């Protein structure tokens, strides 16, 4: 609170960006964690909450006649424009937010003060919800080809890798350590995903320190060990996700890529994904297009094309598709790296795994995928997403691009994913919110030193608890799209990359429908389920009606002939003794035989009993069941009028006899 100069400012206007003339008047509050705007209108009383950690930039604009404008851009693509009456108050709010949005130490982040009112045991259970050891067991590891290595225990070899790593069985500790010394940041080749159907694998590392001519025997042996771990293939793909020009430039700095003359049985492949600086600028250009007020279609499309954003998304997708095909169709193992192996490598490995394994297309499986390929393998969350005050050139939307790749796949395969768009948007939101501890720091080592699991809560438990909100109504576990590998069209024209308005314009009320597609589909699904339940109830009622009719038929069968011992005249006291054919009225029902209990006791129903004993059966038999009213004429005489089908087969049908 010591950084807040003015905690409360009244008569502040919140400008509607779609309709600038519509400005809500209210009060602005600054707290230790949020900026809060509360409208004065009591009905309804609206509040706008913004986390300090979500603030990307703050722009103090020139003072106007109405006040001093303050423009706040957020990392979740929300834009807030405030007009503060006094310039002094505006300056105090501006200075306060500059400091609050850029904390200098982790303890200032929201997750260390966030308290969802859970006890210690519940917090611990939230952190063990996602267990990577169970995930590797699900893959079929360890086995004859891969083993769990403790070579990185206490982070002795690589401080940005996790302590538990899977390596080929033929790779000794000497080979591993030697390979790490020849790789940037000592990130040696390790297993990311094992495709147990054909023993192919996806491995990841950083670039080799090869320069123009340097080589390392242990690193060459490491790649041979990866090849031997796949008996179905005699070569390994080495995929460098960088543009070839960039990789060649790194050679001049003593880094670079593998020389095929030194590494036997490898096939080298460049992909061409640009670096973090190009991606940051591309996103900025696209957001500038999104901020245009009432742009023409041509201006919007030109700006989107000029940003290059969708081209970068396609490059990441192309890399993932190439790796997935190499593994599933060619049966070849793949080693993926970029420069340091924690940005483009994470993108490509996770996209390929998502295409290969339907488990990662489920709610829990997707959490596991992010935990495995992003969190445990040392993606630099702090540097890339500006959790703390640092170098702005390190910020880049790396995981945002991966999340968009998933959304593009969901648009192409709408029945293949258990989760919906809202699930992806909420994950993106909490990567920047710092409300949970999952996405803090740059490595597993840093998180353990800060005791993140003991001091914060897990996002995965929160999402899992509310999983009903994130279900895809089109998902079917038995659908062809949910089985095995996703095969994308080979021709580019069959795969359309779209602008994700649900992400980048989701706060623009005038651009989004009042009801999202997901909510609409969920409503349709719930209504369909309700109708199915009503149909089931009606079918049960039909069974009851049919049972009554069968019992009446039984009675008629037993009393069809006149009683020889009764003292009553059958012509005077019988309601009807003319056989009738009800097959025309019952042709919609399946033939049923009466139960054993019905055979033992005859059921005699009076006309009044038939009408009053079950109001539902009496009142609704015509309207809902399609069964003709079986009530008879008075005992004074007369017979039932024969049905339309009575002359078809009188000998095969039995008459219904109802005793008055």
UniProtKB/Swiss-Prot annotation:
UniProt keyword terms in alphabetical order: Coiled coil, Cytoplasm, Hydrolase, Lipid metabolism, Membrane, Phosphoprotein
Top class in the EC scheme: hydrolase
Catalyzed reactions per annotation: a 1,2-diacyl-sn-glycero-3-phospho-(1D-myo-inositol-3-phosphate) + H2O = a 1,2-diacyl-sn-glycero-3-phospho-(1D-myo-inositol) + phosphate; 1D-myo-inositol 1,3-bisphosphate + H2O = 1D-myo-inositol 1-phosphate + phosphate
Domain of life per record: Eukaryota
Compartment(s) where it occurs, according to its Swiss-Prot or TrEMBL record: Cytoplasm; Endomembrane system
Keyword Phosphoprotein part of the UniProt annotation: yes
Biased composition (Basic and acidic residues): 641-653
Keyword Phosphoprotein applies: yes
Domain Myotubularin phosphatase: 126-504
Annotated Polar residues bias: 566-596
CDD domains: PH-GRAM_MTMR7 (cd13344), PTP-MTMR7 (cd14583)
Active-site feature positions: 338
SUPFAM superfamilies on file: (Phosphotyrosine protein) phosphatases II, PH domain-like
Binding site for a 1,2-diacyl-sn-glycero-3-phospho-(1D-myo-inositol-3-phosphate): 250, 275-276, 339-344, 384
Residues bearing the modification Phosphothreonine: 578
Residue numbers spanned by region Disordered: 554-660
Bilayer topology term: Peripheral membrane protein
Reported tissue expression: Expressed specifically in brain.
InterPro entries: MTMR7_PH-GRAM, MTMR7_PTP, Myotubularin, Myotubularin-like_Pase_dom, PH-like_dom_sf, Prot-tyrosine_phosphatase-like, Tyr_Pase_AS, Tyr_Pase_cat
Gene Ontology molecular function: inositol bisphosphate phosphatase activity; phosphatidylinositol-3,5-bisphosphate 3-phosphatase activity; phosphatidylinositol-3,5-bisphosphate phosphatase activity; phosphatidylinositol-3-phosphate phosphatase activity; protein tyrosine phosphatase activity
GO biological process per UniProt: phosphatidylinositol biosynthetic process; phosphatidylinositol dephosphorylation; protein dephosphorylation
Family named by the database record: Belongs to the protein-tyrosine phosphatase family. Non-receptor class myotubularin subfamily.
Subunit structure: Heterodimer (via C-terminus) with MTMR9 (via coiled coil domain); the interaction enhances MTMR7 catalytic activity. Does not homodimerize. Interacts with RAB1B (in GDP-bound form).
Protein name: Phosphatidylinositol-3-phosphate phosphatase MTMR7
Organism: Homo sapiens (Human)
Encoding gene per record: MTMR7
């Amino acid at each position: 609170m010591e950084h807040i100069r003015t905690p409360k400012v009244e008569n502040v206007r919140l400008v509607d960006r779609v309709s600038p003339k519509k400005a809500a008047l209210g009060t602005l509050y600054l707290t230790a964690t949020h900026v809060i705007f509360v409208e004065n209108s009591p009905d309804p009383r609206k509040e706008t909450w913004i986390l300090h950690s979500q603030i990307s930039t703050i722009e103090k604009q020139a003072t106007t006649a109405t006040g001093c404008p303050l423009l706040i851009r957020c990392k979740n693509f929300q834009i807030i424009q405030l007009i503060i009456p006094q310039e002094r108050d505006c300056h105090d709010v501006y200075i306060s937010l500059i400091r609050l949005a850029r904390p200098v130490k982790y303890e200032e982040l929201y997750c260390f003060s966030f308290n969802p009112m859970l006890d210690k045991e519940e917090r611990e259970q939230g952190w063990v919800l996602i267990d990577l050891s169970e995930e590797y067991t699900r893959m079929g590891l360890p086995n004859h080809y891969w083993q769990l290595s403790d070579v990185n225990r206490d982070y002795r070899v690589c401080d940005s890798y996790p302590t538990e790593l899977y390596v080929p069985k033929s790779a000794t500790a000497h080979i591993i350590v030697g390979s790490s010394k020849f790789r940037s940041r000592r990130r040696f080749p390790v297993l990311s995903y094992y495709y147990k159907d054909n023993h192919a694998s996806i491995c990841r590392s950083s670039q080799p320190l090869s320069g123009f001519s340097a080589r390392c025997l242990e690193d060459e042996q490491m790649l041979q060990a990866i090849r031997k771990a796949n008996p179905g293939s005699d070569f390994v793909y080495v995929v460098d996700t960088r543009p070839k020009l960039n990789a060649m430039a790194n050679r001049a700095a003593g880094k670079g890529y593998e020389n095929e003359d030194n590494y036997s049985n490898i096939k080298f492949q460049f992909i061409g994904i640009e670096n973090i600086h190009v991606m940051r600028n591309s996103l900025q250009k696209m957001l500038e297009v999104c901020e245009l007020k009432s742009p023409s279609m041509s201006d919007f499309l030109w700006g989107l094309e000029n940003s290059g954003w969708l081209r970068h998304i396609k490059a990441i997708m192309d890399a993932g598709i190439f790796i997935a095909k190499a593994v599933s169709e060619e049966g070849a193992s793949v080693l993926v790296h970029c420069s340091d192996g924690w940005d483009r490598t994470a993108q490509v490995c996770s996209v390929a795994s998502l295409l290969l394994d339907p488990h990662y297309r489920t709610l829990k499986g997707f959490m596991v995928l992010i935990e495995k390929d992003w969190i445990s393998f040392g993606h630099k969350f702090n540097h890339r997403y500006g959790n703390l005050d640092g170098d702005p050139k390190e910020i880049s939307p790396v995981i945002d691009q991966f999340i968009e790749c998933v959304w593009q796949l969901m648009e192409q395969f709408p029945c293949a994913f258990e989760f919906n768009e809202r699930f992806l948007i909420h994950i993106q939101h909490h990567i920047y919110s710092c409300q949970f501890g999952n996405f803090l720091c740059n490595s597993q080592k840093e998180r353990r030193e800060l005791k993140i699991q003991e001091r914060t809560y897990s996002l995965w438990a929160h999402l899992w608890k509310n999983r009903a909100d994130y279900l895809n109504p089109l998902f079917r576990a038995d659908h062809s799209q949910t089985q095995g590998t996703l095969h994308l069209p080979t021709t580019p024209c069959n795969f359309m990359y779209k602008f994700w308005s649900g992400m980048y314009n989701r706060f623009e009320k005038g651009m989004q429908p009042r009801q999202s597609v997901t909510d609409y589909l969920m409503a349709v699904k719930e209504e369909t389920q309700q109708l199915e339940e009503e149909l089931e109830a009606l079918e049960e009622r039909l069974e009851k009606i049919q049972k009554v009719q069968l019992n009446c038929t039984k009675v008629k069968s037993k009393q069809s002939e006149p009683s020889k011992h009764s003292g009553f005249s059958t012509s005077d006291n019988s309601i009807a003794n003319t056989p009738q054919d009800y097959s025309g009225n019952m042709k919609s029902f399946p033939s049923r035989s009466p139960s054993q209990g019905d055979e033992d006791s005859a059921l005699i129903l009076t006309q009044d009993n038939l009408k009053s004993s079950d109001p539902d059966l009496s009142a609704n038999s015509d309207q809902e069941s399609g069964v003709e009213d079986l009530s008879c004429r008075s005992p004074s005489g007369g017979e039932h009028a024969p049905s339309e089908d009575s002359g078809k087969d009188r000998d095969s049908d039995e008459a219904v006899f109802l005793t008055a």
